[in-house]
A protein has these predicted regions:
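Interface amphipathic segments
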Residues: 1-393
C-alpha cells in the first residue's frame, strides 16, 4: 500500500470484538513500513491534524530513510509488541509487554537494543557524540502520573568527546525523575562505582550518593588536552541539594584523592565543601589539606561574581577584557546593607598551584580577606604572603 508520497506499508491485520474498543483484540503484523521524515510529518498532519515538532522532524531527517517492522497482539490495555527500525544511522529493536494492574496502573516490561547507532549524526552533534551500542531492560508500572520501574542498562560502546567508552552498567530503580541504584564503569580508562540517589522530581535537585573513583585517565578521555599524563582517583560522598551555588545546601566530601599529571602527583586526604544558602543568606565553605575558604553574603553569587569581575577590570586594567557596565537590574539585585566577606587561608598549596600554572609558588601561611558591597561599590582587600612567584619571577 502506498500512503501519500514517500510512505510504503505492507501489513496484515485481524480485529475481533468491535464495536466495544475496550474488549477489541488486535493482531497486527507490519513486515514493512518505509518512510521519510517529510512523509511522516505530512502523515501526522493528515491523521492528528497537526505537524510534528521541528526538533523531532530534524532528528527523523538526520536518520535518513526509515524502515520499520512491527507486531502487535492483544487489547489496547494489555498487549505484546515487537518493533524494529532500520535507519541510515543504525538499527534499533524494542520489545514491550503491558497489562493492567490495581489502582489504574499498568505493568510494563520490555527491552531495547541498539547496535552501532550513530548518535552524532542522529542528533546533529558529530563534534561530541559517536556510535552507541547498548541494551536496556525495564520492569515496572506506569499510570496516574506515576512511573516506577527497575531499570538495567549495559553500554558496550559509546563515543563521547572523541573517546569510545565501554563496560558501562546501570542497575537501579527509577521513580518518575528519581534514580536510586548503582552505576559502574569498567572501561580501561574509567573505573568507578556509584551508589545512591539522584532526585530531580522537586524544583531543587537532591543528591545522596557515594562514588568510588578508582581510576580516570583524563588525558585519554580527552577531558584534559593540556597534559599528556592526567590521572585522577578518589572517593566522593555527597548529601546535598541545589541547582547552583545560590541554593546549594548540604555537604560534599572528597577523600583519598590523588591526581597525577606529567611527572608529578597531588594527594589530598580530605576536602569538604559545605553550603547553607537561601534567598536571604549565602554561606559556602571549603576545608582541605591545601586551603580553607569561607564566603558569607546576602547577595546572590551571580551578582557577586559579576561585581568582582568588574572590579578586577577597574582596579587591574592590565587584565584586559571588555569594559563591563553595571545595569539597573544588577544594582537592584545587590543588597544595600550587605558586606560580603571572602576569607582564604593557604597552606601547602604549591602542588595545586603548579598544576594550575606551571612554576607558580605561593608561600605557606598566605591569606586573603576581601570585604565588599556591590550595592555601594565599596571594596576592602587585605592580603599577606611572604612570596608569590612564578618560575622565580
Amino acid at each position: 500500500m502506498q500512503i501519500g508520497e514517500g510512505t510504503t506499508l505492507v501489513a496484515d491485520a485481524s480485529v475481533k470484538g468491535l464495536p466495544d474498543i475496550r474488549k477489541t483484540r488486535f493482531d497486527l503484523s507490519v513486515p514493512r513500513l518505509r518512510s521519510t521524515a517529510r512523509a511522516v510529518d505530512e502523515l501526522a498532519l493528515g491523521i492528528a491534524g497537526r505537524k510534528l515538532s521541528d526538533k523531532l522532524v530534524g532528528v527523523l531527517g538526520n536518520s535518513g530513510q526509515i524502515d520499520l517492522n512491527a507486531r502487535f497482539r492483544g487489547l489496547l490495555s494489555s498487549f505484546d509488541m515487537q518493533l524494529g527500525a532500520a535507519t541510515g544511522v543504525g538499527n534499533v529493536s524494542c520489545n514491550l509487554k503491558m497489562a493492567p494492574v490495581k489502582g489504574g496502573l499498568s505493568s510494563v516490561r520490555g527491552d531495547v537494543e541498539t547496535r552501532n547507532l550513530r548518535l552524532g549524526e542522529l542528533l546533529d552533534r558529530r563534534d561530541l557524540l559517536g556510535n552507541a551500542t547498548l541494551t536496556a531492560y525495564v520492569d515496572g508500572v506506569i499510570g496516574r502520573g506515576v512511573a516506577d520501574a527497575n531499570v538495567v542498562g549495559n553500554v558496550t560502546q559509546l563515543g563521547f568527546n572523541g573517546y569510545v567508552y565501554d563496560s558501562l552498567r546501570l542497575d537501579g530503580r527509577l521513580r518518575n525523575r528519581e534514580f536510586d541504584g548503582r552505576i559502574t564503569a569498567r572501561d580501561p580508562n574509567l573505573d568507578f562505582d556509584f551508589f545512591g540517589t539522584v532526585d530531580l522530581n522537586d524544583s531543587v535537585p537532591r543528591y545522596d550518593f557515594t562514588m568510588d573513583l578508582r581510576h580516570a585517565d583524563l588525558a585519554r578521555l580527552h577531558v584534559n588536552r593540556r597534559d599528556s599524563v592526567s590521572q585522577l582517583s578518589g572517593r566522593i560522598v555527597a548529601a546535598a541539594g541545589g541547582r547552583s551555588l545560590d541554593d546549594l545546601n548540604g555537604r560534599i566530601q572528597v577523600t583519598d584523592a590523588r591526581y597525577r599529571y606529567n611527572d608529578k602527583e597531588i594527594a589530598a586526604a580530605s576536602m569538604t565543601v559545605t553550603g547553607e544558602n537561601s534567598e536571604r543568606s549565602k554561606f559556602v565553605e571549603l576545608r582541605s589539606d591545601f586551603a580553607d575558604v569561607t564566603f558569607r553574603s546576602k547577595t546572590s553569587y551571580r551578582t557577586v561574581f559579576e561585581y568582582l569581575r568588574r572590579s578586577a577590570w577597574k582596579y587591574l586594567p592590565m587584565l584586559g577584557g571588555e569594559k563591563w557596565e553595571e545595569t539597573p537590574s544588577e544594582r537592584k539585585a545587590a543588597v544595600a546593607n550587605d558586606f560580603s566577606l571572602l576569607s582564604v587561608n593557604i597552606r601547602n598549596f604549591n602542588p595545586v598551584a603548579d598544576a594550575v600554572s606551571t612554576g607558580l609558588q605561593i608561600a605557606d601561611g598566605s591569606s586573603l580577606q576581601l570585604l565588599f558591597n556591590p550595592a555601594s561599590d565599596q571594596l576592602s582587600l587585605k592580603a599577606a604572603s611572604e612570596y608569590i612567584e612564578r618560575r622565580r619571577m
